């Protein structure tokens, strides 16, 4: 496929697919392109994008992390439990939330370290190591909540998780951060969810780390050719441990954001995101063989799936049909990567 049109289609198929989605759902889904519809896409996309970013780091090294969904659920429970305990101990709601977030992110690094040591030091296949870690984490999550969703979180958590950067009210104009007080029945427009901004900041840091630092270059080297990377002086064991810890950090952050948005903790909160996270990375141009992939591409893949999820729901399509669509998209992405790698991975 050396024809210019064929090359363009192979390299830009994801963008074209996104454009097709937007065109179809703008007609089939009532209100899809409205402010509310767009922000539903963004809300769904936050958890998905953070998990997909976690997967990007691992897939670039030639591995895969099957624990991120369980880690997300674990983080929702730990953050909710910590927040409630600190609040009951007499700390202010704001300080309770802040310390719970920091503590959860720190605790979340432990499963990532375990996976990294299993893969990097003991040479356990990544899918087995992370599946085992995920199972352990899920079991601990179930023990922590005893089959009941973790609650008793300060109400401020919900206010933070569902806040916006900008508000607009008739006669009041724009308001930054705080929702203006208006008379009953007056509609206030909300713009830019705060959790979307927080997600964008961390994803941006992840993109910089992977593409602009020596750490990122070493990750690509390990995924491209492990033996050559070792001969070049890279310590794969130590580096892979760090990569899986970063993956766990992003998964834990996703869980914290979920807790803030829904003010609860659930062991299975992230399970349904696992397949989508992997698919988003592949759609974004990453190779499951390692050495290729970008966070920017993952953002595009996550956006495609978030639009698909929202569009199908607004069009009244059954939930299970979404899984069929995601599976077909994954097959398409893998086939394009398999048969036209020299076209889609060649630098512009």
Predicted regions: what is each one?
Residues 1-23, 27, 231-238, 308-348:
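Cytosolic-side transmembrane-helix boundaries in multi-pass membrane proteins
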Residues 4-11, 35-41, 91-102, 177-196, ...:
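Interfacial loop-to-helix junctions that mark the boundaries of transmembrane helices
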Residues 14-27, 55, 105-108, 134-142, ...:
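Hydrophobic core segments of alpha-helical transmembrane domains in multi-pass membrane transport
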Residues 23-89, 117-124, 228, 283-296, ...:
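Single transmembrane alpha-helix segments in multi-pass membrane proteins
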Residues 244-252, 257, 261-327:
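Transmembrane alpha-helical segments in multi-pass inner-membrane proteins
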């Amino acid at each position: 496929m050396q024809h210019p049109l064929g090359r363009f289609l192979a390299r830009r198929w994801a963008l074209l697919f996104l454009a097709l989605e937007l065109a179809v759902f703008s007609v089939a889904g009532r209100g899809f392109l409205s402010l509310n519809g767009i922000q539903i896409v963004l809300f769904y996309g936050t958890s998905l994008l953070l998990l997909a970013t976690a997967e990007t780091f691992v897939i670039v090294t030639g591995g895969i992390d099957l624990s991120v969904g369980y880690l997300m659920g674990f983080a929702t429970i730990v953050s909710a439990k910590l927040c409630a305990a600190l609040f009951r101990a007499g700390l202010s709601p704001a300080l309770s939330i802040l310390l719970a977030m920091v503590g959860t992110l720190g605790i979340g690094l432990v499963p990532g370290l375990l996976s990294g040591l299993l893969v990097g030091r003991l040479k356990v296949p990544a899918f087995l190591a992370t599946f085992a870690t995920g199972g352990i984490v899920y079991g601990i999550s179930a023990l922590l909540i005893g089959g009941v969703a973790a609650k008793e979180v300060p109400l401020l958590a919900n206010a933070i998780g569902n806040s916006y950067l900008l508000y607009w009210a008739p006669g009041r104009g724009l308001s930054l951060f705080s929702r203006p007080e208006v008379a009953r029945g007056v509609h206030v427009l909300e713009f830019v969810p705060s959790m979307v901004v927080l997600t964008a900041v961390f994803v941006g840091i992840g993109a910089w780390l992977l593409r602009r630092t020596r750490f990122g270059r070493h990750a690509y080297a390990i995924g491209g050719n492990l033996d050559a990377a070792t001969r070049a002086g890279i310590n794969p064991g130590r580096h892979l441990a760090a990569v899986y810890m970063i993956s766990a950090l992003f998964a834990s952050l996703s869980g914290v954001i979920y807790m803030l948005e829904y003010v609860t903790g659930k062991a299975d909160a992230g399970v349904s995101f696992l397949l989508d996270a992997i698919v988003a990375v592949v759609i974004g141009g990453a190779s499951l063989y390692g050495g290729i992939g970008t966070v920017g591409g993952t953002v595009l893949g996550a956006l495609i799936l978030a639009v698909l999820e929202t569009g199908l729901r607004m069009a009244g399509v059954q939930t299970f049909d979404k899984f069929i669509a995601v599976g077909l998209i994954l097959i398409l992405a893998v086939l394009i990567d398999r048969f036209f790698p020299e076209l889609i991975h060649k630098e512009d």
